[in-house]
Design a protein with these regions (language model features):
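Short hydrophobic beta-strand element within catalytic cores of glycosyltransferases
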Residues: 40-41, 299-302, 312
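Glycosyltransferase donor-sugar binding loop
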Residues: 41-46, 169, 203, 227-242
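Short His-centered aromatic/hydrophobic patch
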Residues: 92-98, 116
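A conserved, positively charged/aromatic
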Residues: 106, 112-143, 149, 156
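Active-site donor-binding acidic/aromatic loop of nucleotide-activated sugar
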Residues: 236-241, 254-263, 269, 319-320
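Conserved acidic donor-binding segment of nucleotide-sugar-dependent glycosyltransferases
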Residues: 314-315, 319-326, 335-341
């Protein structure tokens, strides 16, 4: 295939908050800045305005539907869009849209790339069949080595198609020098922090598997002085919050641990912290929060599994605890709190260099666009 300006269509369920959604927005911007035409098709969401600003065309379509009875109608609507826009390559970012869109690759005679953001497990045959659509493309993007391994475990014959492209951090957005004093002061008032007491931050959505309860237990064993803000826990249900608050009271941590709602300025909130903990009980596919903390020069602590194992070198740019081990997590937190200022600075500098070299937004976009170009060049060669 030879053409002056290729059109790439990314398809995903919706454009609300999440790593998949942010990745699509970032790639779409990189496409328009690199002489590609960028199309995104989804059921919509608040990221639509960002797409319009970067020159991407967005089509609203019910590609999030998991009802097979609707797929033929939606596929026909999608086919019209792809033909009218003369799309040259499809990038499918989730399972339901992939089941709808994948057949159009062969119908329209264009290459198809899929992204896998979730861990595949050896479950029942129906789940395996549902997941299998993400392995059928001309190329597969795995967002971490952990995800690559899970794909190969369940679908061993597709290993040759897998390309590991780690999710990236926007180094301008997460640059300490770019966070103005006014933003920090505003967040400081919201967090209501005590002066001269180390700050531990956990920022996540309100789900028990994210490790909120385990962290609270670990903190009860820490002898050093600290204050901890659980950002996002305050968005949880009344029942969810009650479980955590009851535990905080039972362990006599009321003066040290508080639940807060999520913030629109996570950069300013994290810059106020000394340590960022992400104690997910099950392996995270990647966990961008750990890298965002490193980009800000903070010390990340996580369990040694999933994506965290790929982004933290224990003792160099953060600390890894034994998976789901409260005592190990507590000891790592105590170790981080006991570091001298010069030791923290050394870890922070190593962390920033690690992100800049290996996990930047620019590197992610460059590798993804390079894969697009390769697939376009090789298709029907």
């Amino acid at each position: 295939m030879s053409k002056n300006k290729y059109t790439i269509a990314q398809i995903l369920p919706a454009l609300n908050t999440g790593g998949v959604e942010r990745g699509v927005v970032e790639i779409s911007k990189a496409l328009t800045e690199s002489n590609f035409r960028s199309i995104v098709i989804s059921s919509g969401g608040h990221f639509e305005s960002q797409l319009r600003r970067n020159g991407t065309i967005h089509y609203k379509l019910d590609v999030h539907s998991k009802n097979p009875l609707r797929w033929v109608k939606i596929r026909n609507q999608l086919k019209v869009i792809l033909e009218e826009e003369k799309v040259d390559l499809l990038h499918l970012c989730s399972r339901a849209p992939a089941w709808i869109a994948f057949p159009l690759g062969s119908i329209l005679d264009i290459p198809v790339i899929t992204s896998v953001h979730m861990r595949f497990r050896k479950t029942n045959i129906f789940k395996k069949i549902y997941n299998s659509v993400l392995t059928k493309g001309d190329a597969i993007i795995a967002i971490s080595k952990h995800i690559e391994k899970s794909i190969k475990t369940v679908f061993p014959k597709v290993g040759h198609k897998i390309n590991i492209i780690h999710r990236g951090v926007d180094l301008e957005l997460f640059n300490p020098n770019n966070i103005k004093a006014g933003r920090i002061i505003a967040q400081s008032k919201i967090l209501n922090l005590r002066d001269n007491v180390p700050v531990i931050v956990m920022a996540s959505r309100p789900a028990m598997w994210k490790g909120y309860s385990v962290l609270i237990t670990a903190l009860s064993k820490v002898k050093e002085d600290f204050q901890c803000v659980l950002i996002g826990a305050g968005d949880g249900s009344t029942k969810f919050q009650k479980i955590l608050i009851d535990k905080i009271i039972r362990l006599k941590l009321e003066a040290k641990v508080k639940l807060l709602k999520s913030t629109r300025d996570i950069q300013a909130a994290m810059i106020l912290g000394d340590i960022v903990v992400m104690p997910s009980l099950t392996p995270e596919p990647f966990c961008r929060v750990i890298l965002e903390a490193q980009a800000l020069g903070k010390i990340p602590i996580a369990f040694d599994h999933g994506g965290a194992s790929e982004t933290i070198i224990d003792g160099k740019n953060g600390f890894l605890a034994k998976p789901v081990d409260v005592d190990s997590l507590s000891k790592k937190i105590s170790l981080a709190l006991s570091l001298k200022g010069s030791q923290r600075e050394k870890i922070g500098e190593f962390a920033k260099k690690n992100v800049s070299k290996n996990f930047s937004h620019d590197k992610m976009c460059k590798l993804t666009l390079s894969l697009y170009k390769r697939c376009l060049a090789e298709y029907k060669r």
